[in-house]
Amino acid sequence: MKKPFPFSAIVGQEQMKQAMVLTAIDPGIGGVLVFGDRGTGKSTAVRALAALLPLIKAVEGCPVNSARPEDCPEWAHVSSTTMIERPTPVVDLPLGVTEDRVVGALDIERALTRGEKAFEPGLLARANRGYLYIDEVNLLEDHIVDLLLDVAQSGENVVEREGLSIRHPARFVLVGSGNPEEGELRPQLLDRFGLSVEVRSPRDVETRVEVITRRDAYDADHDAFMEKWGAEDMQLRGRILGARAALPQLKTPNTVLHDCAALCIALGSDGLRGELTLLRAARAQAAFEGAEAVGRSHLRSVATMALSHRLRRDPLDEAGSVSRVERCVAEVLP
């Protein structure tokens, strides 16, 4: 079976790749929303990043990929204490999915054949410690998106139905993609995503030719292509793991907190999610760059992806949300 396309070999789309790397460093940033044209590497980037990350150690047979035997939920009835290594999970959420399929439900077959009340885990269980990818998230039913965002934020899935009361860990990075021409997300849901980026098809011939060349090389001689880009992927993996380890020791000056608040006030963003996400993303960026403390340069680097989707629409301002954030950053964080 072919390995996913190397993350380092993806041409362009730097902001999308940056957002995904930051969530790999600190999943607490929240999900990533990627809006833009079809065929711009959105799903490719998710699978490539997950493949780039180290294998996870999990209990054999555990439906929620528990890292320790004692963490396996009771309802799973896992007797094995054998630890195995498996790739970071990437779970696709289909558009017509039901709530039962997402969160889990009563195992009807066991109930009918054995008369036992057992829990059949859903997609959230499989996605634990990995990625949950939703293509065309703007076409998914609002209550499903709301449910996913709730679980992604809490890190726990709670199921109360048909006489069952089940809890299990569900810590994953939610990545949603979509085409804005096919419909938009409600502002309440937009605000729940940590980062948001816009992607566009390349407009210059050289970039498009490079995309075609790399994809053709990947399909023609998969092993040689993977070997060519393997060193860069391993280097990126090392930087991500180093940034994860450095996060707890990273210093955050009070001036940075002041800058976060001042920027969000200037933009008129509602609530405090903007400041919190901006700070988390800036800390991850600083750790990725090997800095000892968060600075204004890190805030400037992540401001558009952390704040552009949280702005109120201004009918008197024809500029897009990204342009408004960039303009405000230039004024508040010179």
UniProtKB/Swiss-Prot annotation:
Name assigned to this protein: Magnesium-chelatase 38 kDa subunit
Entry keyword annotation includes Lipid metabolism: no
Pathway: Porphyrin-containing compound metabolism; bacteriochlorophyll biosynthesis
Keyword tags: ATP-binding, Bacteriochlorophyll biosynthesis, Chlorophyll biosynthesis, Ligase, Nucleotide-binding, Photosynthesis
EC top class, as a word: ligase
Binding positions (ATP): G36, D37, R38, G39, T40, G41, K42, S43
Keyword ATP-binding carried by entry: yes
NCBIfam families hit by this protein: BchI-ChlI (TIGR02030)
Gene source species: Cereibacter sphaeroides (strain ATCC 17023 / DSM 158 / JCM 6121 / CCUG 31486 / LMG 2827 / NBRC 12203 / NCIMB 8253 / ATH 2.4.1.) (Rhodobacter sphaeroides)
SUPFAM superfamilies registered for this protein in UniProt: P-loop containing nucleoside triphosphate hydrolases
Coiled coil: none
EC number(s) recorded for this UniProt protein: 6.6.1.1
Record GO terms (molecular function): ATP binding; ATP hydrolysis activity; magnesium chelatase activity
GO BP annotations listed: bacteriochlorophyll biosynthetic process; photosynthesis
Function noted in UniProt: Involved in bacteriochlorophyll biosynthesis; introduces a magnesium ion into protoporphyrin IX to yield Mg-protoporphyrin IX.
Similarity section: Belongs to the Mg-chelatase subunits D/I family.
